[in-house]
Swiss-Prot record:
InterPro entries: Chorismate_synth, Chorismate_synth_AroC_sf, Chorismate_synthase_CS. GO terms for biological process: amino acid biosynthetic process; aromatic amino acid family biosynthetic process; chorismate biosynthetic process. The gene is aroC. This is Chorismate synthase. FMN binds at residues 125-127, 238-239, 278, 293-297, 319. It holds the Pfam family Chorismate_synt. Homotetramer. Reduced FMN (FMNH(2)). The lineage of its organism: Bacteria, Pseudomonadati, Pseudomonadota, Gammaproteobacteria, Enterobacterales.
C-alpha cells in the first residue's frame, strides 16, 4: 500500500488501523538539538482525542504518545523519530454485521475493489483514527516553527451546516468543545448537535486554518507550489471534499480590481490570495479553508449491497461523530505545519544565501 508518506525533507510516514494494536509514525528530517518531550506532543493530541465531549464519538482513547527513537536526553538527535499510540478502546463486535456489507458513503466498497479484501472493523486504515499520528508529527513541526521562526498556526470551525461562524475572538476557540471563535453562536451549535443525535443523522462543516509569521519565499514552482502542497495535505484528511486558499471560490464573483492585493510602502493592503502568490509565500498570513462532508456513519436506514451484489438496508452501529469537522481542527493545523516545515527546510537548503533589498513587512 503506497501513499503513507508526506513531505520531502520533513517526511512523515504513518501506519496502523482503527482497531489494530496501535498507531504509529516515523518522522524524518527533524533538525538535531531541539528540546522535545512527549508532553510537547500531548497537548494537540488531547485536542483531537475522542470521547472528550458529548458532541463527539464516545470511543474513549487516552491517545498517550510514546517517543520510541530520535530523542536523547530530551533533545532531538537528527535521526528518525518513532512515535506510537496504543489502541485501548476498540469494540470490534460493533462491526461484525457489516463484514459482508458495504456501508454507503464509506471506503468499504473502494478498498475491497482495490485490494480484494478489507478490514471492516471501524474502517481499518481508512478510519480517521489514523490522523492521531499526523497530529503527533504536526506537533513537532509546530514547535520548531514557533520557536525558531515565530510562526503561529491556529485553526477554528467557521461553519456547521447552515450556521456561519465569524472569527471574532481566537481566545474563544480553546474555551468550547466546537473550536468555535464566535461565542454568540454556541447555543445554536448545541441545539443543532442535539437535534442530530436525536435524529441519528450528521452534518457537514467548514474549518479555517491560518499561519502567521511565515516568511516570504516558501514554495517550489511549478509542481510543488506552496498552495498546491497545502491543498494536497488538507485534501488527504478524511471527509474533506474541498479546499480553498484565501478567497477561494469567492474569486469567481470578483473583478481583477477587487481581487488583487495592492501594495504600498506600508505593505499589502488586502490578502485575497491567502498569503501565497505564484505558489510562493508572500509574508502575509497563510489562510486556507476546507469543507468536510457529513459522516455516513449514521443510524438513519440506508440502501446498499452486500458482497454478493444483493440489495440490503443497513443502519451503521458503533460510536461516531455527528460532525467530523469539530475534531478536524487540530488535524488541519498539523497538516499545515507539516507542509510549512517541509518547505522551510527545502527553501533553506537551496536559498539560504539569497539576499534581496525588497521590503518585507
Amino acid at each position: 500500500m503506497a501513499g503513507n508518506t508526506i513531505g520531502q525533507l520533513f517526511r512523515v510516514t504513518t501506519f496502523g488501523e482503527s482497531h489494530g494494536l496501535a498507531l504509529g509514525c516515523i518522522v524524518d528530517g527533524v533538525p538535531p538539538g531541539i528540546p522535545l518531550t512527549e508532553a510537547d506532543l500531548q497537548h494537540d493530541l488531547d485536542r483531537r482525542r475522542p470521547g472528550t465531549s458529548r458532541y463527539t464519538t464516545q470511543r474513549r482513547e487516552p491517545d498517550q504518545v510514546k517517543i520510541l527513537s530520535g530523542v536523547f536526553d530530551g533533545v532531538t538527535t537528527g535521526t528518525s523519530i518513532g512515535l506510537l499510540i496504543e489502541n485501548t478502546d476498540q469494540r470490534s463486535q460493533d462491526y461484525s454485521a457489516i463484514k459482508d456489507v458495504f456501508r454507503p458513503g464509506h471506503a468499504d466498497y473502494t478498498y475491497e475493489q482495490k485490494y480484494g479484501l478489507r478490514d471492516y472493523r471501524g474502517g481499518g486504515r481508512s478510519s480517521a483514527r489514523e490522523t492521531a499520528m499526523r497530529v503527533a508529527a504536526g506537533a513537532i513541526a509546530k514547535k520548531y516553527l514557533a520557536e525558531k521562526f515565530g510562526i503561529e498556526i491556529r485553526g477554528c470551525l467557521t461553519q456547521m451546516g447552515d450556521i456561519p461562524l465569524e472569527i471574532k475572538d481566537w481566545r474563544q476557540v480553546e474555551l468550547n468543545p466546537f473550536f468555535c471563535p464566535d461565542a454568540d453562536k454556541l447555543d445554536a451549535l448545541d441545539e443543532l448537535m442535539r437535534a442530530l443525535k436525536k435524529e441519528g443523522d450528521s452534518i457537514g462543516a467548514k474549518v479555517t486554518v491560518m499561519a502567521s509569521g511565515v516568511p516570504a519565499g516558501l514554495g517550489e514552482p511549478v509542481f510543488d507550489r506552496l498552495d498546491a502542497d497545502i491543498a494536497h495535505a488538507l485534501m488527504s484528511i478524511n471527509a474533506v471534499k474541498g479546499v480553498e486558499i484565501g478567497e477561494g471560490f469567492n474569486v469567481v464573483a470578483l473583478r481583477g480590481s477587487q481581487n488583487r492585493d495592492e501594495i504600498t510602502a506600508q505593505g499589502f493592503q488586502s490578502n485575497h490570495a491567502g498569503g501565497i502568490l505564484g505558489g510562493i509565500s508572500s509574508g502575509q498570513h497563510i489562510v486556507a479553508h476546507m469543507a468536510l462532508k457529513p459522516t455516513s456513519s449514521i443510524t438513519v436506514p440506508g440502501r446498499t449491497i452486500n458482497r454478493m451484489g444483493e440489495e440490503v438496508e443497513m443502519i451503521t452501529k458503533g460510536r461516531h461523530d455527528p460532525c467530523v469537522g469539530i475534531r478536524a481542527v487540530p488535524i488541519a493545523e498539523a497538516m499545515l505545519a507539516i507542509v510549512l516545515m517541509d518547505h522551510l527546510l527545502r527553501h533553506r537548503a537551496q536559498n539560504a544565501d539569497v539576499k534581496t533589498e525588497i521590503p518585507r513587512w
